[in-house]
Amino acid sequence: MWLSVALLTLLDGALAAPARQHSGAFDMPLTWTPFGFTTDAIQIGTPPQPLVCFVDWTWIGQYAFTPRCHGGSQGTYACLQHGQPLYNETESRTFANQSVLYPERTWNPNHFFFYNDLSVGFGSDIERVGPDHQARVTLQLADMHFQLDMVYPFGGVYGLSPVFKSDNASTQSPFYQMWQQGVYRSPLVSFVYCHNSTFDQPTPRRELCHGKDGLQTLGGPSPVLSLSDKNNSSPILWYDNIVFPPVNEIEFVYQPAVYNYWALRLTRHLIGDEEQALNTSIGGNPGAIFDHASYGRGVPMSENSYRRLIEITGGRPVVLDANVAPNNGNQSFVSVDCEKVSSFPNVKYVFEGHDRVWEVTPANYVERREVDGKEVCVLNVRTLGEGDWIIGNFGETFAKDKVVLFDFDKLRVGLADVPAAAY
């Protein structure tokens, strides 16, 4: 795209990552993996044990693989595969056992291991995030009751779920725990995705994500927003978070139930200018869950709106292996004419609280894939539920040209456009 002289002048001093404007924040670089985004910025214990963590907007604490297996630490590899990254509390002189304060907990089913137990004990230790942020936090210490069938490319889960008033430290995000101790001055976290271009459309520059795939800012708004000027502002629209119980029945099924999600109500869903029906039979407008892990891949649609998009785009059924499919949803996939993608309609959403229409362009919801040695363009759509819209996940596909923010104090979700100067 052509840049105006004024914009070129603005960019002249902005090609490096912008200077941090909010003291006390940390811009945590993220690496894309098939599971979701991970970070290598976390260490736990004394001396510090590096722990690559999966960053999860839908989990309620700092989870860590440990040597524990069936309640003991002697038979670790009867549960874990050799080479599995983990945190070993016996090697930390600052570890404190919290088993009396918080008894062991088990979820079954769960969305980690499904119908195998997700069992954790509790302890606290010093967690370091980046070079300058550290505090004692409560940890969820994995106690495996079965053998993992693979080595996971991370040793823990850094949860960023909202924290409710009734929650104690056993189900609190490690970010929230540190913010409560004054380590971060702001209760905000924010995300920007420096993704690869599929159809040569502009994408946020990699240096804005410190050369990585994404940036999860802890303790403030994304520094990308500081690139806006007075004539090209990118205001944040804030939406009040809701509790949406059907999420534990339709999507992330846990027993005991988990309801800590960044969630909004959807008031409109459109394909181009064509309104799509919403299912309002569950006590109001349907739900929108924010999740940038693998379950947030694909533009969220209902079964019926996906069927309509297939009609509009002339989609044809295509069979994709799991390692080729653009997302892990249960819906079927269709191929479309790569030459016609620019003519496809935007997929649109309106959330309760504002009339702003948020859009996903066809260049962001169509993916190129190789099938039998040939390039195929595939609709990257993920559906949940049956019939009209009842629930959907808003993650990396939705966020390709947006900044997503969460406010842990006021329990709000914020959305903003990525400023033009970031491209």
From Swiss-Prot:
Residues 38-416 form the Peptidase A1 domain. Keywords: Aspartyl protease, Disulfide bond, Glycoprotein, Hydrolase, Protease, Signal. Induction: Expression is positively regulated by the cluster-specific transcription factor pytR. The active site is at D56, D291. Pfam families: Asp. GO terms for molecular function: aspartic-type endopeptidase activity. GO terms for biological process: proteolysis. Glycans are attached at N88, N97, N168, N196, N231, N279, N330. InterPro entries: Aspartic_peptidase_A1, Pepsin-like_dom, PEPTIDASE_A1, Peptidase_aspartic_dom_sf. Disruption phenotype: Abolishes the production of most pyranterreones, but accumulates pyranterreones 7 and 8. Disulfide bonds join C338-C377. Gene3D superfamilies: Acid Proteases. The keyword Magnesium does not apply. Its EC number is 3.4.23.-. PROSITE patterns: PEPTIDASE_A1. Residues 1-16 form the signal peptide. Pathway: Secondary metabolite biosynthesis. Aspartic protease-like protein; part of the gene cluster that mediates the biosynthesis of pyranterreones, a family of antioxidative compounds. The first step of pyranonigrins biosynthesis is performed by the hybrid PKS-NRPS synthetase pytA that condenses 4 malonyl-CoA units ato the acetyl starter unit by the modular PKS of pytA. The acyl chain is then connected to an L-serine through the amide bond by the modular NRPS of pytA. A tetramic acid is formed and released from the PKS-NRPS pytA to give pyranterreone 5 with the help of the thioesterase pytI. Belongs to the peptidase A1 family. This is Aspartic protease-like protein pytH.
